[in-house]
């Protein structure tokens, strides 16, 4: 059984689209059914990560966790984030998810 990818996106909506496009492009599939199942949560409600890091802006972790949990509920077996700055919060987010 194939795994389902969950894209925790919206932190740069174009980065989310770009990553999804790359997943499709590199997948060796001859038919639609041979592609990898991908769930996307393009959550534009996630506060600015740079502002949180540099100037004490709103904490993005709660909204990132909500997105991760939504993706898990959608069947994601693995989560990926197409945002470099979001990885600053990786350890905090992964405490709340099983994926």
Spans of model-derived segments:
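Non-catalytic structural scaffold of enzyme domains
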Residues: 1-99
